[in-house]
Amino acid sequence: MDRVGSLPDELLSHILSFLTTKEAALTSLLSKRWRYLIAFVPNLAFDDIVFLHPEEGKPERDEIRQSFMDFVDRVLALQAESPIKKFSLKCRIGVDSDRVDGWISNVLNRGVSELDLLIILGMTMEDSYRLSPKGFASKTLVKLEIGCGIDISWVAGSIFLPMLKTLVLDSVWFYVDKFETLLLALPALEELVLVDVNWLDSDVTISNASLKTLTIDSDGHLGTFSFDTPSLVYFCYSDYAAEDYPVVKMENLREARIFLLVTDNEIERVRLPINDGLEDAMDNVVLRFGHVGKLMNGIRNVEYLELSADTLEVLSLCCESMPVFKNLKSLAIKSTEGRGWQAMPVLLRNCPHLEFLLIEGLLHHVTDKCGDACDCVPREDKGRSLTSCPVNMLEIHGFRGTKKEMQMIKHFLDYFPSLKEMDIYADEDGPTNLEAPGMFEQITQLFTLYDEFYTCDVQFMVRGSLYKKLTAQCCVFKEENLPHRLVRTLG
């Protein structure tokens, strides 16, 4: 008897729960004993995509649809009233909505705790599957994921999910008042994920006293966006800036990731001098970006903050309203050549307890307002914002070996007074200056001088495969001559 076959039924059923339900059902071919194990599998995942293969000889679409629905019926019938933990249903081929109602009702009656639904009946909003009110009346549901093609715009005050802790809404339509009704029905909610939600109103408020984690990933254009979430500890926000942020109550927030989206046209407008006669065209963008300062003020208690390159550019219009981040210990910033650092000086000055700074990409757009955080523009107060920043650990990612980057690194070493460690990670995407003949050796030698001259410990991090490539093409020195204490290879 093989080792797997000797395991008890309960453990085998648990193992099968990690497979798709179709894969679990196929194990019935192994032996008679395996035939009925699927009846006790606590996790079911039905996805019609496993029935849709383009190979020659596959049945027509109607036959595939019927085969899929019959398969779900058989598995649920075989399980009868056995307990169920997770139920995932993903349908893209227009299944019978009445049968979907029956499947969802079946697992709800059996006390399902996690429900994941994606049901596409057609291509228009009118074709959306209307989730039954029973889906919002469960006393056992802990996690609910509602995906594309499902209509929940009917939500009424009679719904109540007392145990629900996680709600994920992906590509659904929503009126704001219905959304607020839904949140009121979730007294235990701790995690909310909103992905590409299509708001049918322009002013949105997220209000929930128990919410701890909020993730927003969209590309909409809202009028106002308010947050009344006093218990929130994690906030990830990726979207175009709203027109205004009237209320941002996040006093217990500990970690925030702000990835605002902007267009090149918007960036071009805000960089133009006001006296260019384009005030009317600029007013809306300038005002909207300026209101992002209210959002930043609402998250001022964070301990960890991550900003995208677009966000950093937007913050150039919020310098006067930038709050003091008195609790901030770690700051991560992504930089690109097309976006500026105008906000970097005030940001660093307003982090009085910053310990760790990560910059992904040192190259950025240079302007006459570039500030003193870099050495792009000669200034009398060069490095002033750095000298007041207590950061002791600096990580630089995406290093490409350019002269400008080397100047920036020396600038940081010169002006960060408390810097104890600097780790520089070589860029692995695409060709870089590091691959030029002799350049890798020159850079490592220069970093060696930095490491010896400054009190800061400088280390150059290179992934193993890239390290072999760079050392293999160097003809003027042997690999054993590299300063191994300085250059560290990564797995």
Swiss-Prot record:
Its main location: nucleus. It is found in: Nucleus. Residues 1-49 form the F-box domain. SMART domains: FBD, FBOX. Signal peptide: none annotated. Coiled coil: none annotated. Pathway: Protein modification; protein ubiquitination. Keywords: Nucleus, Ubl conjugation pathway. GO terms for cellular component: nucleus. GO terms for biological process: protein ubiquitination. CDD domains: F-box_AtFBL13-like (cd22160). The F-box is necessary for the interaction with ASK proteins. Component of SCF(ASK-cullin-F-box) E3 ubiquitin ligase complexes, which may mediate the ubiquitination and subsequent proteasomal degradation of target proteins. Part of a SCF (ASK-cullin-F-box) protein ligase complex. Interacts with ASK4. This is F-box protein At3g59000. It comes from Arabidopsis thaliana.
